[in-house]
Amino acid sequence: MAKQMLIDATRGKRTDKAPWVPYAGCNGAYLIKEKADRYFQDADLLAKGVAAAAKTYHADGIPLLFDLSVEAEAVGCKLEYWEDNVPSVRTHPCETETPEELGLGMFTKSSGRWPIIFEAAAKVKPQLDEMDCAMLGLATGPLTLASHLAGVRIFTAVKKKKEFAHAVIEYAGRLCAESVRFYAEMGCDIIAIVDPVASQIRPETFQEFVTPNCLEAVNAIHDDGSTSSFFNCGDCTKLIDVVCRVGPHG
């Protein structure tokens, strides 16, 4: 295992070989023979599963938690927990009203599952360090988080209701930045903004709505001295240039 090699590669440095990061989410539960619904709500199980995944796959880095519903749940979205998958978001409070109109504020360390995640990080970080494995913190990106808050309406709102879309995505960006700060405090070596649904929009739309609302999070990672990354899913070739301009290390 080679934590520094992964950090170097993420920062654009040449390495002797490609580092290896298995994105083990609910697979961590499988490795320790637990149901995913229990796993994602128990600090001891999370720590055990993350350590097991790092050891089993000889990982150079491993996510502390691969669950993009954490921030949404922490501000009031209701989740559906599953035995064999990550939780899904069931309710979307901003379907018809902006976060300001609803009086939604910033989550704290005691909101939602954040206490569980902080506890799991404290338990597993020393084990990962001993294995020379980087701990990755994954913060839900602005557009994906906005889709949790407002539902699929957000994808038409970026064209037809721009003022509404800006209000929701700006709020999501602030939540993302606070999430990043939490992961930095936990000691994550690499912190990524994970915005999978951003691949569904045009580069021009990304620049208008996503780019400005990632900057606080990216700056928070860099201010901490941590390594930053931006994750996208699907066919993201059209977005490569604009994602790079957001300013992550990798």
Task: Indicate residue ranges for each PLM-predicted region.
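Catalytic domains of carbohydrate-active enzymes, especially glycoside hydrolases
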Residues: 45-66, 181-189, 245-246
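Aromatic- and acidic-residue-enriched segments that line the glycan-binding/catalytic groove
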Residues: 39-40, 74-88, 143-157
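Active-site loop segments of alpha/beta catalytic cores
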Residues: 1-28, 36, 107-250
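A structural signal for well-ordered alpha-helical segments within the folded catalytic domains
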Residues: 44, 48, 115-118
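A contiguous, low-structure linker/loop signature
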Residues: 67-107, 123, 130
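Surface-exposed strand-loop-strand hairpins of Gram-negative outer-membrane beta-barrel proteins
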Residues: 34-45
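Short, glycine/charge-rich beta-strand/loop segments that flank catalytic centers
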Residues: 64-73, 136-144
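Short, glycine/acidic-enriched capping/hinge loops at junctions between secondary-structure elements
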Residues: 31-35, 74-75
